[in-house]
């Protein structure tokens, strides 16, 4: 592989110096920007970052052997990272979206055959090959929007066979697609209909059968639970998360989306790497999260699509909670693959600054999936994952909302998107 020399970026947004701990409070606005910046890459790794004149002098005798990318007038950032998706599923639910727009309640949609169980049915019935192809198309779209790493949850199988199938597809995507896929087991996404009269039996199935097998096969790094009234209680979630820890799976938690339910407190108690949603988290829960360094992953696209109030990002940031952003890509409440759009929504609906939003979609997102030592910032020794945007500065990526400014994506030192087209 020839060296790669990215030169003369109008803004090179490095986010350097935050690999050991996520950015919090006012530090989220310090993006470590280099004007007229350049990056030298070899064998998929960043070798040097700095002003163009410095790197041009340092590598003067080697420029002839490198592939040179002229980034004049453009903004270069770390590859974007999506730390909360439900990437692998079958089918879509636009019909229930129409029902919701006409005033139908969630229970009315469920009773009409919609909701999560509709996706569970479609995902169970889909072949592994069909799931792979459908999910690969979504992953291509993530890549086209500057995303180089995604977290992917199971949770639409809700059976031993179904959950394993989803995770096997996620692993295959990771092995075959430029985008890195980091897998999370979410067997505790809901209680499936066939277990509605024996929910504790389903919980035991998760703890005693699913988790050990997922761990044995190396199909996931994280174990997630949807902790919400009517889904899984804090006590049930604690049992499931502790069972995962016993098998080497790091806890994550869907927390306090609908009402204050102790999810944020539980995340701190069990040492979760992240707590996600947090629309209704208590002040005490946020205080404990900040003390334990639990990342708060916010999902403004979900609130936007459901036409509800978004999480109070300013409250989290002011409490010292490290904040990350994610699409929550899923067919029911956030059918989007555009992390830049989510960043715009974070500014418009949650009053985050553009700098905070970019930090939340890069280095803090890397912390939320345990990858801050290798991705999330542009520093020597890190993996060469970068996005080049046709934007004069990083703010324009979000300011011109709904526009995909991604011109080029580099993954592991290889150009995988060029002029808005995937070139795998």
From Swiss-Prot:
* Keyword Cytoplasm in record: yes
Where does this chain mainly localize?
A: cytoplasm
Binding of 4-imidazolone-5-propanoate: at which residues? Answer: 93, 156, 189, 257, 333
Where Fe(3+) binds, per the record, is at: 84, 86, 254, 328
Name its cellular compartments.
Answer: Cytoplasm
Q: How is the cofactor bound?
A: Binds 1 zinc or iron ion per subunit.
Question: Biological process GO annotation list?
Answer: L-histidine catabolic process to glutamate and formamide; L-histidine catabolic process to glutamate and formate
Record-linked Gene3D superfamilies: Metal-dependent hydrolases, Urease, subunit C, domain 1
Q: What is its EC number?
A: 3.5.2.7
Please state the span of the N-terminal signal peptide per the UniProt entry: none
What cofactors are annotated for this protein?
A: Zn(2+); Fe(3+)
| SUPFAM superfamilies in alphabetical order | Composite domain of metallo-dependent hydrolases, Metallo-dependent hydrolases
Q: Which UniProt keywords apply?
A: Cytoplasm, Histidine metabolism, Hydrolase, Iron, Metal-binding, Zinc
GO cellular-component terms in the record?
Answer: cytoplasm
Q: Single GO molecular-function term?
A: iron ion binding
Binding residues for Zn(2+), per the UniProt record? 84, 86, 254, 328
The UniProt catalytic activity note for this protein reads: 4-imidazolone-5-propanoate + H2O = N-formimidoyl-L-glutamate
- Write out the pathway annotation from the protein's UniProt entry: Amino-acid degradation; L-histidine degradation into L-glutamate; N-formimidoyl-L-glutamate from L-histidine: step 3/3
- Purpose of the protein: Catalyzes the hydrolytic cleavage of the carbon-nitrogen bond in imidazolone-5-propanoate to yield N-formimidoyl-L-glutamate. It is the third step in the universal histidine degradation pathway.
Q: Which family does it belong to?
A: Belongs to the metallo-dependent hydrolases superfamily. HutI family.
Which PANTHER family does this one have? IMIDAZOLONEPROPIONASE, IMIDAZOLONEPROPIONASE-RELATED
- Designated name of the protein: Imidazolonepropionase
């Amino acid at each position: 592989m020839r060296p790669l020399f990215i030169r003369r970026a109008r803004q090179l947004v490095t986010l350097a110096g935050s690999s050991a701990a996520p950015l919090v409070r006012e530090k989220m606005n310090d993006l470590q920007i280099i004007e007229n910046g350049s990056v030298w890459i070899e064998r998929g790794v960043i070798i040097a970052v700095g002003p163009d004149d410095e790197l041009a002098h340092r590598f003067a005798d080697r420029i002839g052997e490198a592939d040179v990318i002229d980034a004049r007038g453009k903004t270069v950032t770390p590859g974007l990272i999506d730390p909360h998706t439900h990437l692998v599923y079958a089918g879509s639910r636009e019909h229930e979206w129409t029902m919701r727009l006409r005033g139908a309640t969630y229970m009315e949609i469920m009773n009409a055959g919609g909701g999560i169980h509709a996706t569970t049915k479609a995902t169970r019935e889909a072949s592994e090959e069909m799931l792979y192809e459908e999910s690969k198309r979504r992953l291509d779209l993530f890549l086209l929007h500057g995303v180089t790493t995604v977290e992917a949850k199971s949770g639409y199988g809700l059976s031993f066979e179904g959950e394993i199938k989803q995770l096997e597809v996620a692993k295959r995507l990771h092995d075959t697609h430029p985008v890195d896929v980091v897998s999370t087991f979410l067997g505790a996404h809901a209680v499936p209909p066939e277990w509605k009269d024996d929910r504790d039996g389903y919980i035991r199935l998760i703890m005693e059968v699913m988790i050990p097998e997922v761990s044995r096969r190396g199909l996931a790094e994280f174990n997630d639970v949807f902790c919400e009234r009517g889904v899984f209680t804090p006590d049930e979630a604690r049992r499931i998360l502790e069972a995962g820890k016993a098998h080497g799976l790091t806890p994550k938690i869907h927390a306090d989306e609908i009402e204050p339910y102790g999810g944020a407190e539980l995340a701190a108690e069990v040492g979760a790497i992240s707590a996600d949603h947090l629309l209704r988290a208590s002040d005490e829960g946020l205080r404990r999260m900040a003390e334990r360094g639990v990342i708060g992953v916010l999902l403004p696209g979900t609130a936007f699509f459901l036409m509800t109030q978004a999480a109070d990002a300013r409250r989290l940031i002011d409490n010292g909670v490290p904040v990350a952003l994610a699409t929550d890509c899923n067919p029911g409440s956030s059918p989007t693959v555009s992390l830049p759009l989510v960043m715009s929504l974070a500014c418009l609906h949650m009053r985050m600054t553009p700098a905070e939003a970019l930090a939340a979609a890069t280095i803090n997102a890397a912390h939320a999936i345990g990858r801050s030592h290798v991705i999330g910032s542009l520093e020597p020794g890190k993996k060469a994952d970068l996005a080049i945007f046709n934007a004069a500065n990083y703010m324009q990526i979000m300011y011109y909302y709904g526009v995909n400014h991604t011109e080029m994506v580099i993954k592991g030192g290889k150009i995988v998107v060029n002029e808005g087209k995937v070139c795998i």
